[in-house]
UniProtKB/Swiss-Prot annotation:
This is Cytochrome b. Belongs to the cytochrome b family. It comes from Eulemur fulvus collaris. The gene is MT-CYB. Heme b b562 binds at residues 83, 182. The cytochrome bc1 complex contains 11 subunits: 3 respiratory subunits (MT-CYB, CYC1 and UQCRFS1), 2 core proteins (UQCRC1 and UQCRC2) and 6 low-molecular weight proteins (UQCRH/QCR6, UQCRB/QCR7, UQCRQ/QCR8, UQCR10/QCR9, UQCR11/QCR10 and a cleavage product of UQCRFS1). This cytochrome bc1 complex then forms a dimer. Heme b b566 binds at residues 97, 196. Pfam families: Cytochrom_B_C (PF00032), Cytochrome_B (PF00033). It is found in: Mitochondrion inner membrane. Keywords: Electron transport, Heme, Iron, Membrane, Metal-binding, Mitochondrion, Mitochondrion inner membrane, Respiratory chain, Transmembrane, Transmembrane helix, Transport, Ubiquinone.
């Protein structure tokens, strides 16, 4: 058995990635979220596949096909809610995973970090298109508002929007292509995950100290397989509590009304995991400026390795940077709250202040404080 595991061409890859992989001996539970994201992706692909067997991508029957899944298909309700709430768990793990990378300086592994940013954009695109598929009010108007943002692009904007819509409004053609993309993208994500892991295993994992752990490595199995299993059980517990007790907690009641192009919902808003970016978009009165701010709010992650001015990799022993990190976290919570509020006083002002703080923290305050901490090392 030992020989098969180490010599068989396929088994050897698995062995070197998940069994005999040398891992740092001191990585904490914050490193669990990578494997949890893998579990979330597997859950989404499996539940999505079963939903696709019963779903029809047509404007006249899409809404009723989702209702049919919940009412008539064996365990259809649990498959649907696992898929919807599984997306929320996916993003929760994703945000913590990115936060961990920022806190402990994992962004210094630039190839892994950049593939991660591409993954984030791909997952966000997939989730957005998935939200359109039930063809409820928020699905339709969310699709209309977000795709319409592309019309802010000079010269080609309006043509681009009509090209994406496949007509002069969000209609049957849009729904069909969104379903096609929503089906294929998770498999592209799975391929990107393998590239992400490939680059990670080239350098080895970071650790809480941010130091080299080459002198002290332990095998991934059994130590971290058991540790990841505990994290997985807790994730399953949280997901099942959500699915079985309050499946619609994170959804929007408007999406239980079939899409109606003649009636606009009072407050158009995306799912909770996009609210922070939506708040940044809304905080700028100019359309093109808002779109640029929206894209930059995510793309800013790509320049974080360049903005890293500290002599220490991790924030573990940098209390001033820690204060700024948790301020950034609080700021993102505020932006998420603002994104779900109507566009009126005082929410507009709070959103603008939180948006300015978000960019100021990342671009100016964090690099400056890191330089101050470098000076403090000499005291």
């Amino acid at each position: 058995m030992n020989n098969i595991r180490k010599n068989h061409p396929l088994m050897k890859i698995m062995n070197n990635s998940f069994i005999d992989l040398p891992a740092p001996s001191n990585i904490s539970s914050w490193w669990n979220f990578g494997s949890l994201l893998g579990a979330c992706l597997a859950l989404q692909i499996i539940t999505g596949l079963f939903l696709a067997m019963h779903y029809t991508a047509d404007t006249t029957t899409a809404f009723s096909s989702v209702a049919h899944i919940c009412r008539d298909v064996n365990y259809g309700w649990i498959i649907r809610y696992l898929h919807a709430n599984g997306a929320s768990m996916f993003f929760l793990c994703l945000f913590i995973h990115i936060g961990r990378g920022l806190y402990y300086g994992s962004f210094t592994l630039t190839e892994t970090w950049n593939i991660g940013i591409i993954l984030l954009f791909t997952v966000m695109a997939t989730a957005f298109m998935g939200y359109v598929l039930p063809w409820g009010q928020m699905s339709f108007w969310g699709a209309t508002v977000i795709t319409n943002l592309l019309s802010a692009i000079p010269y080609i904007g309006s043509n681009l929007v009509e090209w994406i819509w496949g007509g002069f409004s969000v209609d049957k053609a849009t729904l069909t292509r969104f379903f096609a993309f929503h089906f294929i993208l998770p498999f592209i994500i799975a391929a990107l995950v393998l590239v992400h892991l490939l680059f990670l295993h080239e350098t080895g994992s970071n650790n809480p100290l941010g130091t080299s752990s080459d002198s002290d490595k332990i095998p991934f199995h059994p130590y971290y397989t058991i540790k990841d299993l505990l994290g997985l059980l807790l994730l399953i517990l949280l997901t099942m509590m959500l699915v079985l007790f309050s499946p619609d907690l994170l959804g929007d009641p408007d999406n239980y009304t079939p899409a109606n192009p003649l009636s606009t919902p009072p407050h158009i808003k995306p799912e909770w995991y996009f609210l922070f970016a939506y708040a940044i978009l809304r905080s700028i009165p100019n359309k093109l400026g808002g779109v640029l701010a929206l894209i930059l709010s995510i793309l800013i992650l790509a320049i974080i390795p360049i903005l890293h001015t500290a002599k220490q990799r991790s924030m573990l022993f940098r209390p001033l940077s820690q204060c700024l990190f948790w301020t950034l976290t609080a700021d993102l919570f505020i932006l998420t709250w603002i994104g779900g509020q109507p566009v009126e006083y005082p929410f507009i002002a709070i959103g603008q202040a939180a948006s300015i703080l978000y960019f100021t923290l990342i671009l100016i305050l964090m690099p400056t404080v890191s330089l101050i901490e470098n000076k403090m090392l000499k005291w």
